[in-house]
Swiss-Prot record:
Modified residues (Phosphoserine): S40
Assembly: Component of the large ribosomal subunit (LSU). Mature yeast ribosomes consist of a small (40S) and a large (60S) subunit. The 40S small subunit contains 1 molecule of ribosomal RNA (18S rRNA) and 33 different proteins (encoded by 57 genes). The large 60S subunit contains 3 rRNA molecules (25S, 5.8S and 5S rRNA) and 46 different proteins (encoded by 81 genes).
Name of the gene this protein is made from: RPL32
Protein name per Swiss-Prot or TrEMBL: Large ribosomal subunit protein eL32
Database matches in SUPFAM superfamilies: Ribosomal protein L32e (SSF52042)
Function: Component of the ribosome, a large ribonucleoprotein complex responsible for the synthesis of proteins in the cell. The small ribosomal subunit (SSU) binds messenger RNAs (mRNAs) and translates the encoded message by selecting cognate aminoacyl-transfer RNA (tRNA) molecules. The large subunit (LSU) contains the ribosomal catalytic site termed the peptidyl transferase center (PTC), which catalyzes the formation of peptide bonds, thereby polymerizing the amino acids delivered by tRNAs into a polypeptide chain.
Disulfide bonds: none
A GO-annotated cellular component: cytosol
Similarity section: Belongs to the eukaryotic ribosomal protein eL32 family.
Compartment(s) where it occurs, according to its Swiss-Prot or TrEMBL record: Cytoplasm
SMART domains the record matches: Ribosomal_L32e (SM01393)
Molecular function in Gene Ontology: structural constituent of ribosome
UniProt feature coiled coil, ranges: none
GO biological process: cytoplasmic translation
């Protein structure tokens, strides 16, 4: 269940990159769009304007896609999918897909516990229907 040793996970930028003027106009969604105007102060990176996504904010290759526990997540839809993780319990953790019923989740969780596989969302859907 414990993960392999890895460098400290550092997130260089945790805030979402918001689209310019999304706070000013309701019709402008928050999803990031690159500014392309010739006079755009955001594109020209003037002081005091919103920051833009750039390659420097990228994560370390060794810690990219790692969860805080140090595992990479693997989407599981049935018990058969769990069998693929038996040799990789220190590297990968199972994540039960969103559309799996509570009945099947119980079966998957029991098998994961027997195999010693970490599950990232063990309480999903079970707390409501217990």
């Amino acid at each position: 269940m414990a993960s392999l040793p890895h460098p400290k996970i550092v997130k260089k930028h945790t805030k979402k990159f918001k689209r310019h003027h999304s706070d000013r106009y309701h019709r402008v969604a928050e999803n990031w769009r690159k500014q392309k105007g010739i006079d755009s102060v955001v594109r020209r990176r003037f002081r005091g304007n919103i920051s833009q996504p750039k390659i420097g904010y990228g994560s370390n290759k060794k810690t990219k896609f790692l969860s805080p526990s140090g595992h990479k997540t693997f989407l599981v839809a049935n018990v058969k999918d769990l069998e693929t993780l038996t040799m990789h319990t220190k590297t990968y953790a199972a994540e039960i897909a969103h559309n799996i019923s509570a009945k099947n989740r119980v079966v998957i969780l029991a098998r994961a516990k027997a195999l010693g596989i970490k599950v990232t969302n063990p309480k999903g859907r079970l707390a409501l229907e217990a």
